[in-house]
């Protein structure tokens, strides 16, 4: 189990489930040779413990052994007092902009390699898969294959090209997730571009929150939550982006400009906050208070974005530092809500 928790002095020990971590497995083949096409990501190995994700000849992101070595992950989990990690793909590998047959092959490669990483996690690393979301039938088939192989759920991006999460094909996939009991983690992946966003990591600091906000609105105003079963378990990364802060604005627009805003929804956006979860990656107790008050104490799950540099370390720090939380609420955020989100799939994946 996890080691000592870095929290407030005298604070009770709570189990911790981190629903937002990423993996970059080693050993993937030349994707151009394996899947066709060009300009694929590849891994430049710089040392035994360091590498660089390359896209073509462009450096995309430095990564370390935490991304592929379960022993390193478990050591970090012990330092942070984390009992379980949900291990999801790194979105650069989603390949939604590729032909579907290529995306199917890429998904299979990374999903199988992810299982090799999590197999070394002594049952504490819970794998989520990726799917070729641009092809609903192929996405459903790959999800089924992965669930049978030991994955506990699926991570998807927030859109496919110009298709948001209310797209008919994506809704078909979400309905399938509800039917088979697969939890869905939504992570932004393709952010707005242009020179104004090339400074200060602005794509990550402004683009990602805006993209997630839009994907939540697509599910609400696109009428998806009115069509898919309530059994769908879906969680949005990064605290739901800017959606929680601007929920009042969305409600106001729904009432005052319903001709433009209501779309296929049957109620204002605030009526749907019990249909989805968000993680706790907001870093500040005041922001977490807003998140809990807006979403409800049952709808916020600890996430960290481990092992990337914009993630939270130690994991769950903002939850432990937030003195407005009762002990019972803290327990919900640190683990109980995540266990409900994961459901039986977590235990199936850890057999």
Task: Identify the function of each model-found stretch.
Residues 1-15, 19, 26-84, 112-120, ...:
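Mid-to-C-terminal alpha-helical segments outside catalytic/metal-binding sites
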Residues 24-28, 85-87, 93-97, 136-138, ...:
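Short catalytic/ligand-binding loop motif for oxyanion handling, primarily in non-cytosolic enzymes
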Residues 28-42, 101-104, 170, 250-257:
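Aromatic- and acidic-residue-enriched segments that line the glycan-binding/catalytic groove
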Residues 54-65, 74-97, 124-132, 152-156:
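Divalent metal-dependent hydrolysis catalytic cores, especially in the metallo-beta-lactamase
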Residues 90-106, 137, 199-202:
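Surface-exposed, active-site-proximal loop segments in enzymatic domains
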Residues 102-110, 166-173:
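Charged helix-capping and loop-helix junction motifs
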Residues 133, 188-192, 306-308:
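Short glycine-enriched loops at secondary-structure junctions
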Residues 143-295, 299:
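Catalytic pocket-lining loop regions of alpha/beta-barrel enzymes
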């Amino acid at each position: 189990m996890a080691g000592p928790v870095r929290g407030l002095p005298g604070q009770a020990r709570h189990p911790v489930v981190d629903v937002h971590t990423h993996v970059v497995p080693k050993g993937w083949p030349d994707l151009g040779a394996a899947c066709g096409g060009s300009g694929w990501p590849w891994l430049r190995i710089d040392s035994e413990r360091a590498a660089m994700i390359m896209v073509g000849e462009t450096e995309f992101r430095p990564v370390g052994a935490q991304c592929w070595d379960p022993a390193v992950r478990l050591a970090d989990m012990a330092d942070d007092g984390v009992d379980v990690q949900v291990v999801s793909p790194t979105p650069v590998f989603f390949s939604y902009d590729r032909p579907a047959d290529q995306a199917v092959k890429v998904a299979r490669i990374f999903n199988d390699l992810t299982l090799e990483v999590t197999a070394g996690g002594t049952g504490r690393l819970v794998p989520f898969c990726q799917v070729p979301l641009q092809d609903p039938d192929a996405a459903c088939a790959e999800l089924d294959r992965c669930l049978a192989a030991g994955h506990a759920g699926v991570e998807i991006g927030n859109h496919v090209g110009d298709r948001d999460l209310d797209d008919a094909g994506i809704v078909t996939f979400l309905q399938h997730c509800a039917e088979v009991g697969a939890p869905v983690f939504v992570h932004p992946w393709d952010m707005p571009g242009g020179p104004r966003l090339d400074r200060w990591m602005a794509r990550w600091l402004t683009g990602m929150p805006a993209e997630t906000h839009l994907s939540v609105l697509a599910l609400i105003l696109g009428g998806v939550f009115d069509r898919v079963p309530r059994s769908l378990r879906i969680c949005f990364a990064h605290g739901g982006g800017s959606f929680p802060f601007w929920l009042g604005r969305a409600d106001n627009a729904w009432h005052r400009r319903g001709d433009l805003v209501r779309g296929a929804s049957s109620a204002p956006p605030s009526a749907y906050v019990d249909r989805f979860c968000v993680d706790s990656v907001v870093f500040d107790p005041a922001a977490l208070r807003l998140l809990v008050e807006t979403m409800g104490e049952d709808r916020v799950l600890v996430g960290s974005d481990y092992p990337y540099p914009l993630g939270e370390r130690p994991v769950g720090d903002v939850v432990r530092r937030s003195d407005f939380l009762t002990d019972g609420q803290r327990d919900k955020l640190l683990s109980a809500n995540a266990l409900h989100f994961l459901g039986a799939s977590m235990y199936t994946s850890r057999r």
